Amino acid sequence: MSRTNLPIQPAKMSDATSSKPQIFSIQDLKQAASDKMSQMYRDYYNGGAMDNITLASNEAAFDRYLLRPRVLRNVSNIDMTTTLWGTKAALPLGVSPSAMHRLAHADGEVGTSKACAARNVPMILSALSNDTLEDVSGQSSDGSTPYAIQVSPFKNRQITTNLLSRAKAAGYKAVVLTVDAPMFGRRLDDLRNGFSIPPGFSFPNLSAQTQSGSGGLGGGIPDLSFDTAATWEEKIAWMKSQTDLEIWVKGVTSPLDAQIAIEQGVDGIIISNHGGRQLDTTPATIDILREIAPIAKGKTRIAIDGGFRRGSDIFKAVALGADFVFVGRIAIWGLAYDGSNGVGLALDLLINEFKLCMGLAGCSKISDITPAHLSILNAKGVLESVY
């Protein structure tokens, strides 16, 4: 049975405290977090576009990739570290940009960042954050945790230039341009719920002229018009003229676009279908990675998000050629469950599962993880190599 077909079971209650669920997996955390959120905000975070086909596919696709462990390997000392944006990271795992963390918990993006910094886990901050980018990166007291700022193709380019300037001054290492959202996807749950944000919500990283309007999401969202005429050639060249931060693009799902990204000289791509929130019935990102990695590996850095729920999912992505994995909803679930401490719990679950998977698969360092550690089950029930 696919993991997406498994019913969400209520988290177990301890004997000592019947109100405190025991969290042993991301699935447990999702349930506990969802129980704490209102329907409007729970559906906003958990839902996708239209019929949620891509949302479900992102998660279910991992079950097709089967682990092939190597045995009698020295795994007495497992090193999960890697590099991102020229900086050392604890493992190939980071937090994706997602808007308005204070909808989940008052700790907001600062709380998410605090948990990331304590574990040297990179974070991409959304332009639509509720905390200043300076306060967010300031949670890494020694500056060792890598941060990037996310931007969209705003029609008002002054928004982007302001963000780039502030991010550079605050020690950010990269800018991540979201390229799969020239307009907002149709999210039926948000429409049914009449999605809006609480009065008084602020977006301190945006210029004053954006602080009113609907922005296409719902009441109270800044009025951010997107440049629907943006093209690869013009947009990337302009970004390069504005900053010396690394430039990554997020939202690549076509091998053709991966090739163009390489030709335009971006520093990295993030294979992403926006968590199934933009165009429904696009392929699962882990399947797209299998297409794109042979084209892009060694020519640009490759990251991926979408559907990751286990440390073994991270392992599978690295085996298929990803340099890095990002998660979005998982951090939100942690935040909703217990603020910054909940984000830490979420990250620790994935970190511990990933380390265990490396050890059981016979890998003592990231470079040991190869396509030989995976097989895929074809329609005839026969195991095949992934490449």
From Swiss-Prot:
Q: Which InterPro entries match?
A: Aldolase_TIM, Alpha-hydoxy_acid_DH_FMN, FMN-dep_DH, FMN_HAD, FMN_hydac_DH_AS
What does this gene product do?
Oxidase; part of the gene cluster that mediates the biosynthesis of fusaric acid, a mycotoxin with low to moderate toxicity to animals and humans, but with high phytotoxic properties. L-aspartate is suggested as fusaric acid amino acid precursor that is activated and further processed to O-acetyl-L-homoserine by cluster enzymes aspartate kinase FUB3 and homoserine O-acetyltransferase FUB5, as well as enzymes of the primary metabolism.
Could you tell me which pathway this protein works in?
A: Mycotoxin biosynthesis
Which annotated residues bind a 2-oxocarboxylate?
Answer: Y44, R187, R277
Q: Which organism is it from?
A: Fusarium oxysporum f. sp. lycopersici (strain 4287 / CBS 123668 / FGSC 9935 / NRRL 34936)
- MF terms (GO), sorted A to Z: FMN binding; oxidoreductase activity
State whether keyword Oxidoreductase applies. Answer: yes
Q: Known EC number(s)?
A: 1.-.-.-
Which family would the database say this protein is a member of? Belongs to the FMN-dependent alpha-hydroxy acid dehydrogenase family.
The Swiss-Prot or TrEMBL record lists the needed cofactor(s) as: FMN
Biotech applications: Fusaric acid is phytotoxic to plants such as cotton and banana. It has been shown to induce programmed cell death in plants. In addition to a mild toxicity to animals, fusaric acid exhibits acanthamoebicidal, antioomycete, and antimycobacterial activities.
Gene name tied to this protein: FUB8
**Sequence segments annotated as region (Disordered):** 1-20
Q: Where are the transmembrane segments?
A: none
Instruction: Tell me which residues bind FMN.
Output: S126, Q150, T178, K250, D305, G306, G307, F308, R309, G328, R329
Entry protein name: Oxidase FUB9
